[in-house]
Amino acid sequence: MSPRAKRRKRASPTDLYRTCKQAGTCPPDIIPRVEQDTLADRILKWGSLGVFFGGLGIGTGSGTGGRTGYIPVGTRPTTVVDVGLAPRPPVVIEPVGASEPSIVNLVEDSSIINAGSSHPTFTGTGGFEVTTSTVTDPAVLDITPSGNGVQVSSSSFVNPLFTDPAIIEAPQAGEVTGHVLVSTATSGSHGFEEIPMQTFATSGGDGGEPISSTPVPGVRRVAGPRLYSRANQQVRVRDPAFIDRPADLVTFDNPVYDPEETIIFQHPGLHEPPDPDFLDIVSLHRPALTSTRQGTVRFSRLGRRATLRTRSGKQIGARVHFYHDISPVAPEELEMEPLLPPTSEPLYDIYAESDFLQPLDSDVPAAPRGTLSLADTAVSASTASTLRGATTVPLSGGVDVPVYTGPDIDPSVGPGMGPLVPVIPAIPSSVYIVGGDYYLLPSYVLWPKRRKRVHYFFADGYVAA
């Protein structure tokens, strides 16, 4: 018996209607159900033409009884019906026609207007007297200036921005305060305000002055290469050939290259570069000029080592930052003058050999105490040894030379070595115990039973005499 095929569920009528309506491939029961054109729907449509059921909800709806639902006969609905607000009565407008009279008072009532005080009347006597006269001759005006000389006027304006004043006069107190607008030059004491001036830039200083001009606003600085990251090994190059001939430090050959571009090196299997810092370097990138915190210019190049090589031929290595500091101009050195007076004794080096050092007398007997044994050079002392307590002895040998401090001492009168007498020690070499019993200290007796085994000593008790 063959297995029964699994029944697949058909899609909903709504989904089938959307896809098959336009193509015309819908099943016969899909279109009447979606468009509500079944036999039951037609009976309800025909019956509703002659029967009206109101809001009972009898029809093709959900059968909930309409808005208020189904309630028992003789009871009130449990829901509250919102009846809303009562409408306001309309405002009655009385139209006024053109035939109806309109009374407008054109003359105002004069009883409400104050007439004011009476005007004074002039009788012509008293007050000002006005004299009138009539002149018939024309008026002649003399506009010729007095004198026969020519008058010339000149004005000059001094711009302090372009003219250096020869004499500067301090302003008065009123001109400084700003309350007096016009003033004249007067003699005597003047009040003025002193403003301290600040020097912004000098030609030579201690290095704290600005090294660049005021930056232009809106200029965006271009990010430089990251030379001091953790991924780069820092190597300082002291050879100045690194600036113009970096290839000479990597290989003995001098390939044709552009110093402003990246230099690629091809090394044999075993090679030794002229500079050991450039071992296994296969490429040097273009140079970069930066500044350090000390104000010097630093010449830098990034390189790559080929330390490992895989089977596929790929080279793996670390990145190296080679840099060379361009030293600034060295400051001028001043010759130092000696500060000691010319009459003072010169200082001598005990390690230096001088021509004016005189050899010591080899017949001087050696002292039994404080003997200094020197090696392999002639013993000599300077002429400054005549001073009390000052003797210059170089590190030389060949003869045992006594060295003394303090005043001059004659070696022949030095103390001699007498016979040594042994001293009997006061502490006895053996211990004698006089008594019969030995008692342990109470602190050791009262210990608990479970204790660590402790070795007792003779000093942990006492002897009964």
Swiss-Prot record:
Gene name in the database record: L2
Checking HAMAP family in the record gives:
PPV_L2 (MF_04003)
The entry describes its oligomerization and partners as: Interacts with major capsid protein L1. Interacts with E2; this interaction inhibits E2 transcriptional activity but not the DNA replication function E2. Interacts with host GADD45GIP1. Interacts with host HSPA8; this interaction is required for L2 nuclear translocation. Interacts with host importins KPNB2 and KPNB3. Forms a complex with importin alpha2-beta1 heterodimers via interaction with the importin alpha2 adapter. Interacts with host DYNLT1; this interaction is essential for virus intracellular transport during entry.
Per the entry, what this protein does is: Minor protein of the capsid that localizes along the inner surface of the virion, within the central cavities beneath the L1 pentamers. Plays a role in capsid stabilization through interaction with the major capsid protein L1. Once the virion enters the host cell, L2 escorts the genomic DNA into the nucleus by promoting escape from the endosomal compartments and traffic through the host Golgi network.
Question: By its UniProt entry, which InterPro entries does this protein fall under?
Answer: Late_L2
Drop me one GO molecular function for this one. Answer: DNA binding
- So what family is this one in? Belongs to the papillomaviridae L2 protein family.
Instruction: Specify the signal sequence span.
Output: none
Q: Where in the cell is it found?
A: Virion; Host nucleus; Host early endosome; Host Golgi apparatus
Q: Which UniProt keywords apply?
A: Capsid protein, Cytoplasmic inwards viral transport, Disulfide bond, DNA-binding, Host endosome, Host Golgi apparatus, Host nucleus, Host-virus interaction, Late protein, Microtubular inwards viral transport, Phosphoprotein, Viral penetration into host nucleus, Virion, Virus entry into host cell
The record's Pfam families line, in alphabetical order, gives: Late_protein_L2
Q: Which GO terms describe its cellular component?
A: host cell; host cell endosome; host cell Golgi apparatus; host cell nucleus; viral capsid
Task: Report the principal subcellular site.
Answer: virion
Biological-process GO terms, alphabetical: microtubule-dependent intracellular transport of viral material towards nucleus; symbiont entry into host cell; viral penetration into host nucleus
Its protein name is Minor capsid protein L2
Post-translational events: Highly phosphorylated.
Per the Swiss-Prot or TrEMBL record, what residue ranges does the short sequence motif Nuclear localization signal cover?
Answer: 1-11, 446-454
Q: Which organism is it from?
A: Human papillomavirus 57
Q: Which cysteines are joined by disulfide bonds?
A: 20-26
